Regions:
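Alpha-helical transmembrane segments of multipass membrane proteins
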Residues: 22-26, 48, 117-121, 142-143, ...
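Juxtamembrane membrane-interface segments at transmembrane alpha-helix termini
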Residues: 50-59, 144-151, 170-172, 273-285, ...
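Juxtamembrane and boundary regions of transmembrane helices in multi-pass small-molecule transporters
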Residues: 31, 167-170, 178-230, 389, ...
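Membrane-embedded alpha-helical segments and adjacent helix-loop junctions characteristic
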Residues: 55-145, 298-385
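Alpha-helical transmembrane segments in multi-pass membrane proteins
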Residues: 39, 43-47, 51, 74, ...
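Short, amphipathic, aromatic/basic-enriched membrane-interface segments that mark the entry/exit
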Residues: 4-13, 100-107, 123-129, 229-238, ...
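Hydrophobic transmembrane alpha-helices of multi-pass small-molecule transporters
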Residues: 1-77, 195-205, 209, 213-320, ...
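Hydrophobic transmembrane alpha-helices that form the pore/transport pathway of multi-pass ion
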Residues: 107-199, 361-403, 468
Length: 471
């Protein structure tokens, strides 16, 4: 019995299985019928059939799915809390006030770079990309939509800013996990990341500034501002009091309050504002918390901004994450990851090829596991001996883990991060993917440094020998 449980797929079987999964997900996305969710669900059926055909214990394999899903339960709860917060913020007039002030104060040409900077600062200070996207990101999306700026561009600026802070903040979970996996010091890890992150951030800021001036040329009039503001004033009581939920969540995040608790308390505050300021009933507030807000405004642009939110709107994203992460856990149990990763590692013959291999492994593990922690652990576990053999400092490995595993999330439509960004910002993955400049420039710089030797620190020979003797 134990022999049956330990049986795994070989390399050809693993590649065939991955091809089936990719095709099923791609077909569902292409046909626009259920998105990746049905394709990912089908992958569970494929796994069951493969287990039966090749005599592998399905009970043992599916246990890997449940173990993997347990790791992302906080993310699932966070998604639903975000849905509640968006709905209650809309009902309380918080979003309407932000839109009104933004239209009056922000020059549309500068919205994209300002969005990038705002989300970057908030994410660095709070240490959470989820929190900055759910608060500042939602607000900037609303302003951008009202200004007629391409929603994919605004979402791209939000995500790049949030991921920049998440990657560099000493309070971020990924910033602490990567050096822990690579056995590097936190300070060395952050200093090493500056080499790949700061140049790409400057380039990203320049690109969003250029896009901002191109997007708003001749497409924004004073008349449209008046129409939008009058419509918002007609439906909501606007003012500082409606900003209490937004101010509260920023304060709570700065005080290191758990993200889910901060979102929940902000939603409660929004409910009180809705009841006492907007004069909504308790039944209306509870209904909005689940079903989302529906505006009476007839202006199409404002309808697209205000008609959203609610816990129910996030359930499809919860399902995608469950199926995707569960699939990743089963693939690890089947040995699919090990076969593919080992095939990549065998081709390493220089520091440059080692960095390139680490990037590829990081993206492959992210693509399959759909989880940042799992991608860091799997990649670090596989590549650490290779880095030690070539006497490359551990902070270079931890930097590579972040340059690939952390940055890959929003670039994968079924990854937990990709699903979260699309669901929270209300923008399709295909719309914001072309504007994730920071995310796909960072690994390019990392690989360039690997082949040129720039910033690649090697361990002293004596130190390496001493560590070997101790072992």
């Amino acid at each position: 019995m134990s022999g049956t449980k330990e049986k795994k797929l070989n390399l050809p079987q693993s590649l065939l299985f991955l091809l089936l999964i990719i095709v099923s997900v791609a077909v569902c996305i292409r046909l626009k019928t259920g998105g990746p969710m049905i394709g990912l669900f089908a992958s569970w059926i494929f796994i069951y059939l493969f287990c039966k055909i090749f005599g592998i214990s399905y009970a043992n394999i599916v246990a890997g799915a449940y173990d993997a899903i347990r790791m992302v339960v906080p993310t699932l709860c966070l998604l639903m809390a975000i849905g509640v917060m968006i709905g209650t913020w809309l009902q309380s007039g918080t979003i309407a006030t932000i839109i009104s002030w933004g239209l009056k104060m922000i020059n549309p040409s500068w919205l994209l770079p300002l969005t990038l900077l705002f989300c970057s600062i908030l994410s660095i200070v709070t240490g959470t990309s989820y929190g900055s996207v759910g608060s500042a990101g939602v607000a900037m999306m609303a302003i951008g939509n009202a200004m007629g700026i391409h929603p994919g561009m605004v979402a791209g600026a939000v995500i790049c800013g949030a991921m920049f802070g998440d990657k560099l903040s000493p309070l971020s979970d990924t910033t602490n996990l990567a050096p822990a996996v690579a056995d590097a010091k936190l300070g060395d890890h952050i200093r090493s990341m500056l080499w790949t992150t700061l140049p790409t951030y400057v380039i990203t800021l320049i690109l969003f500034t250029i896009l901002g001036f191109q997007q708003t040329s001749g497409s924004y009039t004073e008349g449209s501002i008046t129409v939008y503001i009058d419509a918002l004033n007609g439906e909501f009581q606007l003012g500082w009091i409606t900003m209490i939920p937004a101010i509260l969540i920023i304060v709570l995040l700065l005080c290191k309050v758990n993200a889910i608790s901060a979102l929940g308390l902000s939603s409660f505050a929004a409910g009180f504002v809705s009841y006492f300021v907007q004069h909504d009933t308790l039944q209306d507030i509870i209904r909005t918390a689940y079903n989302g807000y529906t505006t009476a405004i007839e202006e199409p642009v404002l309808q697209s901004i205000l008609n959203r939110g609610g816990m129910g709107s996030m359930l499809q994203y919860v399902a995608i994450i469950c199926f995707a992460v569960g699939m990743g856990g089963m693939l690890e149990k089947l040995g699919v990851l090990d076969h593919i990763l080992q095939a990549i590692v065998k081709r390493i013959n220089s520091d440059g090829s080692m960095i390139l291999a680490t990037m590829i492994v990081g993206y492959v593990t992210s693509l399959i596991s759909c989880s940042q922690p799992m991608a860091h652990v799997l990649t670090g576990r596989l590549m650490a001996p290779v880095f030690q053999e070539r006497k490359v400092a551990p902070e270079i490995l931890s930097r590579c883990l972040e340059d690939s595993g952390t940055m890959a999330g929003p670039m994968i439509p079924w990854h937990g991060y990709g699903v979260y960004m699309a669901g929270t910002l209300g923008v399709a993955w295909s719309a914001f993917f072309p504007y994730l400049f920071l995310l796909y420039l960072t690994p390019v710089f990392s690989i360039f440094y690997g082949f040129t030797g720039i910033s690649i620190k090697h361990l002293p020979e004596t130190k390496n020998n001493e560590s070997k003797e101790e072992k």
